[in-house]
Amino acid sequence: MNMKKIFKRTSLLLATALIGVTATVQAQKSPQDMDRFIDALMRRMTVEEKIGQLNLPVTGEITTGQAKSSDVAKKIEQGLVGGLFNLKGVAKIRDVQKLAVENSRLGIPLLFGMDVIHGYETIFPIPLGLSCTWDMAAIGQSARIAATEASADGISWTFSPMVDISRDPRWGRVSEGSGEDPFLGGAIARAMVLGYQGKDPDDQLKRNDEIMACVKHFALYGAGEAGRDYNTVDMSRNRMFNEYMYPYEAAVRAGVGSAMASFNEVDGVPATANHWLMTDVLRKQWGFNGFVVTDFTGISEMVEHGIGNLQTVSTRALNAGVDMDMVSEGFVGTLKKSLTEGKITMKTLDAACRRILEAKYKLGLFDDPYKYCDLSRPARDIFTREHRAAARRIAAESFVLLKNEPFEGQGKKSSRPVLPLEKQGTVAVIGPLGNTRSNMPGTWSVAARLDDYPSLYEGLKEMTASRVNITYAKGSNLISDAAYEERATLFGRSLNRDNRTDKKLLDEALKVASGADVIVAALGESSEMSGESSSLSLIHISEPTRQAEISY
């Protein structure tokens, strides 16, 4: 028997032994059983495999056929990947999970994460809109439905809730959080964690429609100076804990399974390398027992902070209390060298590896690596009639009516408030967001069916049938600058630029509006005009748009 066959046989025996352990341990579910299982597993792991559990590369739309020849696939087979994110489709995820379970030496299953922020394929209002409901049951239901759909498509981990308090409207990610109030933010954080993971904090993640939540971005991400994304945060501890920290703590108290480090500095130290934040506050003060993941390239971006090279920043992050490296691959590329040089200890490495393995254990992946890979579930559990009805109801609950008075002007006077509209006459939809499908779901709706959402114009026509004459005019392009507009058409969103002159667009809108009894103005931002790494210096409708002319 040659050495290759001996290795294969040994690997098979090891995998069989592990499967035998998992089949019994998942039935008992005690902390002691989990500790014994992970102790036994870690004794079998090499240093490289332990470091591999801390590695979270991005996949894109990889398939098994493509993956087998890819660098990511090779690393999976070598045990150098702990999880993947941005892989959509349960069949694809099942195939990649099979690669990890059957082709790696120890068969350790992968985590599969995605930004499931305000729905999966059934989309709910953006988080800022959800906060306007002040209805924790509704917000929890939105997370419960999102977890049901995401888990049906193979996802076991969501990078949500985003609970950053924001008080500067120029910041590009205001829409992802609940606004400026820490009490409301804390209540929403709890509701969403329980919605994703299960209602009972002591009995979560048991079902295959419950997924692990990730509170983010720890900490103070929404407090960057001048509303600039990734910027420095410098404030007193009194203000920090009274105005910004409570929502993170509320998520921890609800049992959140993971936390994401933020990009910004706190007290001059990047959060991703901030021991006081990640260890002293998060773990020691609040008792967090999950794992910490960086944001996208959060480790490698610290090189730009001037801390040092990739090895130095990777060492700083691990020693601070970060457990998983998203995309940078600083951990998998440098930690073994740092261990040899004494810059990290085996105790620190083992602690980080253990926390990742504990998350997989709590999710039940050692008992059934394909727990989230039931190929029959998507047709049954995604974009259902019941889910869409809930989304519609919660969206209506989120609306904020600022003013509803009788109309008076242009020689006309009404004795009743404008709303509700009567189903008669002519209604003109005016504005660049009036007839766009892809921008209806809002920002961070990465799994949305962009072509399945009717535009405002289409929806009104369908709802009123032939009883109301619904007309439309664009009035202006969403953004005057074509180059800027191209930047704002991310993630499959389309703005459908109209190349007519500004005057012709405005004249058309005036003509359409003059023939209407009611005008519905659809103005504002596209889904991606601001967001991660983007902020606005002007927060009103003006340049770089021509929309102000329509509103006047």
Protein language model annotation of sequence segments:
Residues 23-542, 546:
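Glycoside hydrolase catalytic-domain context in secreted enzymes
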Residues 550-552:
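Hydrophobic alpha-helical segments, chiefly the membrane-spanning helices
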Residues 1-29:
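Bacterial Sec-dependent N-terminal signal peptides
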